[in-house]
Structures are given as C-alpha cells and as structure tokens.
Amino acid sequence: SGFDAKTQTYDKSTWNYAGADGSVIAITEQKVAEVGAHPEPASPPPALALPEKLAYDFSLQHPHCVFQLLKKHYSRYTPEMVERITGVPKEQFLKAADLFTSIRKDGDMKKAGTIIYAVGWTQHTSGTQIIRTAAILQLLLGNVGRAGGGVNALRGHSNIQGATDMAGIFDILPGYLKVPTPTDTSFENWMKRLTPKPAKPLAWDSFNYWSNTPKFAVSLMKAMYGDAATKQNDWAFHFLPKVDRNFSWAYIWDNMYRGIVKGIFAFGMNGVAIGPDSQKNIDALKKADWLVVGEIYPDETSEFWKSPGITADEMKKIQTTVYRLPCAGFAEKDGTFVNSARWLQWKNAALPLPGDAKLDQEILARIYLKVRELYQKEGGKFPDAILHLSWNYTNPQNPALAEVAKEINGKALADLEDPLTKQQIKAGQQLPGYAWLKDDGTTLCGNWLYSGSFTEAGNMMARRGTEDPSGLGIYPNWAFSWPANRRVLYNRASCDAEGKPWDSSRKQVWWSEATQKWAGNDVPDFKADSKPKDHMGPFIMNPEGVGRLFVPLGAMADGPFPEHYEPIESPIENPLHPQQSTNPVVKKFQTEADKFGTAKDYNIICTTYRLTEHYHYWTKNNPMNVQLVPEPFIEVPAELADKMGIRGGEVLKVTSARGVYQAKAMVTKRIKRMTIDGKETYQIGIPIHWGYRGIAEDEGKTARTPANSLSPTVVDPNAYTPEFKGFLVKVEKA
C-alpha cells in the first residue's frame, strides 16, 4: 500500500479480505487533527468492515489466498538471511526450527508446544509484530487452543495483566472496549465503529462474539454512572472523554517536557528510572507545576532534584511542588493479582498498615471526593462527568475492595430470565456471568470479562481448590480465570472438525452426542450448542471465525504481515531492504533532548535487563536483596574485554547520544561476540535496578544516574513500548 512520508503512515484501505463476489471493502480511517505541539495525533481505529461473504480457497493455491501471500512474504527469510540479520549461525537456527516443528512430524497432532516471551521481545520498535510472528507460527503448527500451547507472556510485574484488563492504558476502557474519539458523536455511532459485523464464508459460520459489544458497553456505563446513565441521555456517553491524541506513557512525559502537561500523579511508577532517557524525564519534572507521588519509599522520581549533576543553582530554579503520599505495601492490603493465564487470585492483607500509610482506594477516593466537592462549589467547564459518577459505596471515603469487586462482576438492576433455561435472577443479585449482560440498562457490570468472579455463591477469586481431574494443569476450582472461568482460550481448536480431541489422552473439550452440547474438562470457548456439522469457526472473537495469519482492517500500523526492521540505532543497515532499515511508521520525538547516535560514533550494542535477585527499583530498599547484589555492573563479553584490556571490577564509562553511565565491569561468557551481516559486533548488558535513591546507593553517597539515562525515547507504533533492548553506546575505561 502507499506510504505517505509526510505523515509516516500507510494507506490501509486495501488491507482487507476479498469478498466472495470479488469485491474488497475499502477501510475508512478518519484522522484527528493535531493538537498543540503534540508530535503524533492518534487516529480512531478503522471501521470494522469485512466483506459479508469472504472469498476462500481450501486448496491454498490461489495466488491471493493468505497462505500464498504469507509464503511469498517470507520467502526472503532464508536460513542464510536469518544468519545475516541475527548473527545466529545457520546450523543453530535450523536445529532450533527442526526441533520446534518436529511436534507435527508425520502429521502427528497430539503434541503441543508453547512460545514464552517477555520484554526481550516487546521492547523494540517492532515489538508487537515480533509477537505477531510467534502467533502466526503457533497458528500454522496448530498450537493455539491447546493445553501446553499458545503464545504466553512472562510479566515483569505480578499484576500487569489485571492493570491492562481494567484499562491501565489510554486507548481502552475496562474489558478492552476502545475509547470514544471526537468522531464518535453519539453512543450509537461509537457502537457502530466498535461492533464488527459477521464475515461468513460460504463454507463455515462465525459466532462473532464482539457483536455483543453494546451489552458490555451499556452495562459498563451503568456501573460508572448508575441512574445518570439512561437510554434517554445516550447512556451518559457524553460524560466520557473523547481521546483526540496519543496519551501513552512516553507521550505524557514528552508533553510534560514541552510544558503542555502541568502535573502528574505517579503511583507505583518510578518514572525517572523506568522510562527511556532518564535525563529527559528529570528535565520534564523540573518544568511541571506539581507532582503527586504515591509510594512506600522515596525514589528517583519523588526526589528527582537529587539526580547527580544537578547544581545548586539549577535546584533553586526548580519550582515543582511535590506531594508524597503514604501508601501501603502489597502485603498490607487485600485485592487481586491477575497472572498471564488470566487467573484472578484474591489475596488478603497479611500485615496492618504502618504509621500514616493509607490504602490505595482511600487515597483515590478522598482525592475524587474533594474534586467533586470543588466542582459542586465552584462549577467548571463540564462538571457533569464528575458530579454524576456513581459512588454508592458503604464507606465512600474508603470503599471496601470486595464491594468494588462485586460492582466489577455486575448485578441485575431488574428481574431477569434466561429465555432458554428459564433461570431467573432477581433485581440486586450478582450476575453469574457475562452471558446475562443486556443493552437495555437492566444490568450493571464494571468489566464484562470479570463477570462471574464474584457471584451470589461468593468470591470465586478466593477459591483454592487444588483438584485437577484432567491432569492438564487446569485446576478449575483455583481462583477464577476470565472469561467464564475458562483456562485455555480458543479451546475448540483442540478438537478436529468432528469435535473429537486431537489427543484422546489429553482431552480439554469435546462434542457430546448425548447432550448435543460441547463439554469438557475446561469451559468450552465456543457456542455451547453449535454442532460440528454447522462448521462454526473456532476463533469466536474474530468476525471471520478463524485465526489471523493476515491482520485485516489496518489493525496493525506497520502492516498485515510482520516484517523485520532494525532498531532505530543499529550497527548495520537492514539486509532485507537497506533503503528502509528501520520501521517506517515509527515517529521520533522532536525536542532538543531527543538525540540519536550512529555506528560511526557508537560502535557497541547495549541492552538493559533485570536480575533474579532484584525487583525493579524497589528491592534496593531491602537489605536482604542488597546483600545478594549490592551494586550495579556492566556485563561485558570476554572477547570484548580481551580486545579492550578490560578486567573484571574495573570501572567503565558507557556513553550514548543521550547520557553517561558508570559501573564496574563484569566479564562473562554469557554474552557472545556476534557477526551480523558480515560485521564483527559486540553487545554489553546493564541491569536497571540502581539509581540515586535507596539503601543500595547508601542514601545518596554512591548515587549514580539510572541505566535508562542511556536509552532512547522511541516507541513501537502499535503498543507504544520503548526500545530498551537495542541501542548504541561506546565503552571506555573510566
């Protein structure tokens, strides 16, 4: 498709399937005008417009079928090309490829293989597409929907999954509902954009479960605004903010650096240390009017003015007002952890609150109630969204989390009856699950995916049953797994077309002729009464009913198939296409702080990582962890150490285009010299856990700049994750 160099975007209008009649529905993608000095206005997701009847070819021979396009696209990725790009010898790559694909040797469908990844994949300017590549491989191998299969993330925090589920990112509402944009002028228009129509090939059917989006959205609005959300006032749709630009992490800090964002709440987030280009973040905080920090320890963000290198004169010029609130630690509060398998596990507080510490919900509630009071007294441009927020908790100043969890689960606002089973739920009762949600205002639910987690039977998240009859690690009575306590998503794919498990000794779900329904050791991820002869596609959340080797509708900013691009800073040009070495839709931030180096000046690759003995920036306040690894180091490959005469324990100075970092050398054989596209290349590694605040730094006596003083502020164009895993530096003895 056409690439617009000015806007750094593709024309995505043809990123779609062909219709059975040969037509292709063009995608309509409306642009949002740029606001202020913001570098990247966001566009609303394109309308979900797949052809009603899709063209298909079971022979996989049509030159435009997805399979043939996929083969053509990846025909350039020969084992020799893989070696040129990655430095992995051809023989090692082939050995790994043969091992993983051997599970399907001779057509054997019994085995399953998983791909497990962490931020080593995500923290690149093509990170989302790297994970997409893994998904394509797993789809081709039949490893999706299988116990022991899938693409599984190892999280860097114990509740990343829960934070995302509950809209911890700017472009979604709870339950992964896309936020409204200024082009959504009514609830109806918003739902039309979000709700996909089924795209059914003549050969199979589609459940298209996202067609229930209006039920999820109306129930969410009732949870948020209660009686103020009615059909007559468009379900309070106009109370919702209309997101007109990118508000992801890097953009917020960039806007603070530009003077657009005047203040920030930093809760559970050491922004100076965790973000790219620590110095830019420090300079951004210098320009802020106020900073509110909610932490259990002082950190680099709450005391940003103590950064090494800030002079007394500079400190006098800083006018930022800092409020540090006394928060509770994880062991001092109850709530839930949600792991990567989507298990909602309830925990109880193990310790009393120390001193003046407050629970998170009390801090947030008191801030909200004070803001509401100010709007009541003083008015404002648009107070309705604040004044009408539903806040009917027993203790408004400090809501019990169990009460909040019940609200998230959902309840009936009127008497309900299932038309098929005649089961009834009385008004005020907890909902058994999301299948009961309505779009007429008779149900309330804070997150449709969590419905079923706190029912009339009690707190399902607190269950601790260890029985596992299947032996597959399903443990159906341990906690609650969204959605519907289902442990393996798309588990219909664990059976053949006739509904028989691929592996009869490891049965997940199956079609029961006796009951004429799907049954199993897991909750079937399928329409319960859809017979195998109905040929319903197993991927019920996609309107086409099948897994996506090709991503239609412009859902990915950089292409329907993944493509390799070099990091923004790389020692080589991209062997696949040197004329476009880096991801073309990645937008660099445009301030004087945003500097990028070249291999001419910076000849070493640097990556950052975490250690087993430390947890981000918090355990450096724990004496036991500090005893295990008391100080940072720079991991240097033995070959580079020999070349430069570096000995273990010598202090090194590492410099990037953005900053300088010093620590002792640790010479290892873990990191190897690489030959990338014929060029001898070296890489160093720096753990991220240290800075200038904590007992590990001897309360400032051994303070240093954070490791991320070196990394660039540049992000993946889909998930907006910074590129921490590959940038250029030079290494010298200090």
List each language-model region with its residue ranges.
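Long, C-terminal catalytic modules of enzymes
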Residues: 335, 342-443, 447-449, 454, ...
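Long, contiguous, secondary-structure-rich segments that constitute the structural scaffold
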Residues: 362-418, 519-531, 539-545, 550-574, ...
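Glycine/threonine-rich phosphate-binding loop and adjacent beta-strand/alpha-helix elements that clamp
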Residues: 320-323, 330-352, 550, 688
